[in-house]
Amino acid sequence: MKKQFNRMKQLANQTVGRAEKTEVLSEDLLQIERRLDTVRSMCHHSHKRLIACFQGQHGTDAERRHKKLPLTALAQNMQEASAQLEESLLGKMLETCGDAENQLAFELSQHEVFVEKEIMDPLYGIAEVEIPNIQKQRKQLARLVLDWDSVRARWNQAHKSSGTNFQGLPSKIDTLKEEMDEAGNKVEQCKDQLAADMYNFMAKEGEYGKFFVTLLEAQADYHRKALAVLEKALPEMRAHQDKWAEKPAFGTPLEEHLKRSGREIALPIEACVMLLLETGMKEEGLFRIGAGASKLKKLKAALDCSTSHLDEFYSDPHAVAGALKSYLRELPEPLMTFSLYEEWTQVASVQDQDKKLQYLWTTCQKLPPQNFVNFRYLIKFLAKLAQTSDVNKMTPSNIAIVLGPNLLWAKQEGTLAEIAAATSVHVVAVIEPIIQHADWFFPGEVEFNVSEAFVPLATPNSNHSSHTGNDSDSGTLERKRPASMAVMEGDLVKKESFGVKLMDFQAHRRGGTLNRKHISPAFQPPLPPTDGNALAPAGPELPSQSSRADSNSVGGPVPSSSGILEQGLSPGDSSPPKPKDSVSAAAPVAGRNSNQITTVPNQAQTGGNSHQLSVGTAHSAAGPSPHTLRRAVKKPAPAPPKPGNPPPGHPGGQSSPGTGTSPKPSTRSPSPPQQQQQQQQQQQQQQQQQQQQQQQQQQQQQTPGMRRCSSSLPPIQAPNHPPPQPPTQPRLGEQGPEPGPTPPQTPTPPSTPPPAKQNSSQSETTQLHGTLPRPRPVPKPRNRPSVPPPPNPPGTHMGDGGLTPSVPTASRIVTDTNSRVSESLRNIFPEIHSDLASKEVPGHILLDIDNDTESTAL
């Protein structure tokens, strides 16, 4: 207590009073003392922040720390999810990523244990052990110095007072002297110890700095190990992703999509084509009518994920067509490529048709292999679609307009509208001829179900079922329609578009047997084996003048002796299986065409094995129909002139269209005056009466056998039939002078057509279109009997009721474009063929039902 009191007294004197304060430390030691506090603060905060950086639990071993890491929990979650997803791409990705995260967690736990042992513990020792010990010695030195100063002050005071009281002070002074010396010794000892510790601390400062070097080295080592784990996992995950074929097809380059999927035809193209072949070939406005946005988006997503469940889209062909257009448009490079854009546009400006087709063929061969195969596949489908343009209204021109901008566009920058406006004209001029002559550009048939992944529908929707025989390879189950439905369809086509292709429709009527509900074998004479392809259909096919537009549905036109021609039913339109039902079969046709048709039932019965069905015209009790009155006001043209020497066995009154004067093409003329209309109406009625009398005579003179026309008559060609510019490849079973060559590496120009040897007869017969203009005089009624031809010469009837096609009939010439009759016609009328062959026939001549007459239309 006494020492403590003396210390406090001395401290007060030094602080408040003027007592001398002894400083035992040197300046260097004082600087070291001031630095100790800073170093301790630094070590303390570093230790605290490092603990915060740890993800594991501090102070535990490596195994327990690894289990508590967040990365370990993430890895376990990924591995559990991968087990649930099994062999999917996402499952494989999660499995690989989970393993990598687990390895990263292990490396992190090892890193934290090392940092805690090698860095954090030494820093904690500096801040909490070494520096506090030095500071404790400094305080001890301060107390010893106070004691020493106190003893020395008392000794000095006792020494001063010894002069006055000398007897009692010697012993006290000696005691104080001993205390002072002892206190001084303690101060020196403590001072030396403190100085030694301070110098040692300063000497270890470089060693303390190595802790932070070790920290960075530990972190670098951890990151290297973590990087090794990641570099091992990344290639494996990329391999899983590259091997997975189910990637979006829309917006992906064609080559990449085909390589990844291992396909020859792009999946969206094949899927959409197969769906449209099932239900869309008869859909009006296909590729023009837009689909619902939600349905289109759903179909695109289904194609992107390569799903096979596309059954629900059979009922919406417009959505399928929209998806096909969208895929072609979203390709990074168009199907016809940017590199050939300049060549395509240059070819589009070529005026000469033959050169244009040759240039197009050459440019097609320059397409890359993948683009060429897919372009060929698509063009073949579009050509098949155009075959039913009478129903779906999608002609090659319409298809080129709506689909062409999706096949080729410029690489230049700009809005979609600007690019389409700049390209559409050239694209249409390129795509349209390629679709028209698809068989010449790409010979051979195309199997649309390339991948064999699409199964035909068992019961297709009747609203979208395909009715033509040409669509039989699409896999649909055709529903046979009655003849009346087919006739109504032809009538509808007549009302909507007067440009009727007679020859095309006749060939279609003969070939497409699926259009008919019933076909009676009684009306199909057996074909002789020698010339089965050229046999004409049984029954006369003579359309009347008042039903020119209906010639597509009832047969090819043959000139009669008067202004009004007989109208017969082709075998395809005879729905009843028995001849006695011919009246009921002809009734719908008569109602549709507004003609008065009288059927002779016993005529077909007396025909023997030929089963000929003859239909004549007669007056109805109700008078002429409104259609007849409306068409009677036309300005009729005279009938074609008579041939100089009619063939034997045929009536001399029958006219031949193969005479020197060819009929002119159909042109529109103004309506005649009212007075002239009345006169012509009377003439029309008189002609009908005369025709009725002639029909009665015909019934009396009718003999069994097939009705034939003169062999000198040239083929009657429809004026609107386009000239065959590039040829189609010869079909199976088609006879010709020699097989048509395929296009060579550099094809010869298709000069109507290039490999046209197999189509020589067809090209000659199609040149018989009227091109010489002539005035239209008012025809005078001529009384010409329409007596059927006499019986065939002996030897023409075969034992089985068949007919030997020794003389080609008019119906055979009209319907069979591959007949060889044209050779004999050129021998009979060489000047006509030489004259007409040198004239250019327009590609499309439309029939004007209201203004054109029989001769002008022919």
UniProtKB/Swiss-Prot annotation:
Q: Which residues form the Rho-GAP domain?
A: 252-442
UniProt-listed GO biological process terms? actin filament organization; calcium-ion regulated exocytosis; negative regulation of small GTPase mediated signal transduction; regulation of actin cytoskeleton organization; regulation of Rac protein signal transduction; signal transduction
Compartments where located = Membrane; Cytoplasm; Cell junction, Tight junction
Q: Which UniProt keywords apply?
A: Cell junction, Cytoplasm, GTPase activation, Membrane, Phosphoprotein, SH3-binding, Tight junction
Q: Which residues carry this modification: Phosphothreonine?
A: 742, 746, 748, 752
**Chief subcellular location:** membrane
Tell whether Nucleus is among the UniProt keywords. Answer: no
Q: How does it sit in the membrane?
A: Peripheral membrane protein
- How is the subunit organization of this protein annotated in UniProt? Component of a complex whose core is composed of ARHGAP17, AMOT, PALS1, PATJ and PARD3/PAR3. Interacts with NHERF1, FNBP1, TRIP10, CAPZA (CAPZA1, CAPZA2 or CAPZA3), CAPZB, CD2AP and SH3KBP1/CIN85.
Please give the name of this protein: Rho GTPase-activating protein 17
- The species is Rattus norvegicus (Rat)
Q: What is the lineage of its organism?
A: Eukaryota, Metazoa, Chordata, Craniata, Vertebrata
- In the UniProt record, what gene is named as encoding this protein? Arhgap17
